[in-house]
Amino acid sequence: MSSSLANRNIYTVSRLNSEVRLLLENEMGIVWLVGEISNFSAPVSGHWYLTLKDSQAQVKCAMFKGNNRLVNFKPQNGQQVLVKARLSLYEPRGDYQIILESMQPEGDGRLQQQFEQLKMQLAAEGLFAQTRKKPLPENPRCVGIITSRTGAALHDILHVLKRRDPNLPVVIYPTLVQGEEAAIQIAQAIGRANTRAECDVLIVGRGGGSLEDLWCFNHEIVARTIAASEIPIISAVGHEIDVTIADFVADVRAPTPSAAAELVSRDHRHKQQALHQWQAKLASTMRHYLAQQETQFARLQHKLDKQHPQARLERQQQQLDELSLRLEQKMQQRLATQQQRWDRLSHKIELHSPIHLIRQQRFNLIQQEQRINQSIQRYLIQSRHQLALLSEKLDAVSPLAALARGYSVTRTTQGELVRQSAQVKPGDTLVTQLMDGEILSTVNSR
C-alpha cells in the first residue's frame, strides 16, 4: 500500500454505518414528525414497523414494544399521526430510519406539539428566566388593559378596579383575542402602549376557552413582544387551569382577569394582595424551574437511552425480526417449489398407475356399453315399426278381417274347407267359423 493511502482514514462499511448512526442519534436529538402511515407491520416480537409519508417523501420507522404499549389506539394504514422520534440508522442495510417514542392522531396533538416546541425554544433563549422579569409598581398611576372591548374579561377587570380603587386611571387598548389576526393585533397593542408610555403596568388577557380559542397567546410574536416590553405585563389568560406561552414570558401570571385587577389595585387588603403577588412569582419561578428540570431530564434521558443496553437490544431485535421474516419467506418459497415438484411427480405416477389404466378401461367400457344400449334401443324401435307395418299388411289379407266384415268360413269335421255344396251330403256335420266363435250344423238337404 502506498504512503498516500496509508495516511488516509479508510472506513469499512460497518464502521461507516456505525459512525453515521451515532452522528444522527447524538446530533439531531428529538424531532416531531407528522405524516401518513403505510406498510404497517406488527410481528410477534411486539415491535412495530411502518413508513411515514407525505405527498413528496417517505421515511422508514420503528417503534419498539416498550414505547408502543403506551399508544392508546391501533395504528392503521392511511392514518395521519403526529410522532415524537429520534433519528437513527439501521446498520446492516445502511437504511436511514427514525425510532418512534410516542404517537398520537394528528389534530389536537399538532397544537400541543407546537406549544412544546416553542416553549422549549424560548426557554433555551432565556425568555422565561426570573432574572429578566420586571417587578410590578407598588402604586401604579395608570393601568393599561389589552383585551377585547366586548369580552367578559374587560367587564371583570373594570368591575374589580372600580370596587377596589375607583380613582385609578385606566387606558383600554382594544384588540381581537381569538382568530388568525388576533396575535398580530395583540403584539401591536403592546407596542402601542410602550410607545405612548402612559401606563405603569399592562394587563394582557381574555376569558377562558379551548386550546384553539386561546392559541393567539401561544404565538411567538406575542411572546417576543411581551418579553421586549419596557412596561411590566401581567398575563391573565383564561382560567387558572389554562396555561399559555404568554404566561411564561410575562412578568407576572394571574390565574384570571379578575385576579390581575386585584394585583394592580391597592386597598386595605394590601398585604393580602402582596402575598398573592409573591405566590404568583413563586409559582412562576417553580414552573420555570420545573420546565428547566424537565428539559434537562429529557436530555439526560435521551443520552441514557442511547447508551443503555436496551437500545442495542432493540437494534438487534429489529435485525432478528428482519432475518426471521427473510427466513420465513425463503421457507415458504422452498415449500412452494417442493409442492410443485410433488404435484408433477404425483401426476406422472397417476398417469402410469394400473389403477389409472383400470379406471380408463372402465370408463371406455362404460362408454361402449352406453353405445351398445343405444344401438339396441334404436334396433328395437325400428323392429317394432317394421312389425307394425307387417301387421297392417297381414291384417289386410287375413281371413279374420273378412270374418270381421260379416263373412264366415265353413269346414267339415275333418277340417276340410267347404267351397262348394257338392262337397257335402245330407247328414254331414259342418263347422262354421264366425268372427267371435264356431257353429256346428247338420246338412238336411242340398
Swiss-Prot record:
<comment type="function">
    <text>Bidirectionally degrades single-stranded DNA into large acid-insoluble oligonucleotides, which are then degraded further into small acid-soluble oligonucleotides.</text>
</comment>
<dbReference type="InterPro" id="IPR025824">
    <property type="entry name" value="OB-fold_nuc-bd_dom"/>
</dbReference>
<dbReference type="Pfam" id="PF02601">
    <property type="entry name" value="Exonuc_VII_L"/>
</dbReference>
<dbReference type="GO" id="GO:0005737">
    <property type="term" value="C:cytoplasm"/>
</dbReference>
<keyword id="KW-0378">Hydrolase</keyword>
<dbReference type="GO" id="GO:0006308">
    <property type="term" value="P:DNA catabolic process"/>
</dbReference>
<dbReference type="Pfam" id="PF13742">
    <property type="entry name" value="tRNA_anti_2"/>
</dbReference>
<comment type="similarity">
    <text>Belongs to the XseA family.</text>
</comment>
<dbReference type="GO" id="GO:0008855">
    <property type="term" value="F:exodeoxyribonuclease VII activity"/>
</dbReference>
<keyword id="KW-0540">Nuclease</keyword>
<dbReference type="GO" id="GO:0009318">
    <property type="term" value="C:exodeoxyribonuclease VII complex"/>
</dbReference>
<dbReference type="GO" id="GO:0003676">
    <property type="term" value="F:nucleic acid binding"/>
</dbReference>
<dbReference type="InterPro" id="IPR003753">
    <property type="entry name" value="Exonuc_VII_L"/>
</dbReference>
<dbReference type="InterPro" id="IPR020579">
    <property type="entry name" value="Exonuc_VII_lsu_C"/>
</dbReference>
<protein>
    <recommendedName>
        <fullName>Exodeoxyribonuclease 7 large subunit</fullName>
        <ecNumber>3.1.11.6</ecNumber>
    </recommendedName>
</protein>
<comment type="subunit">
    <text>Heterooligomer composed of large and small subunits.</text>
</comment>
<keyword id="KW-0963">Cytoplasm</keyword>
<keyword id="KW-0269">Exonuclease</keyword>
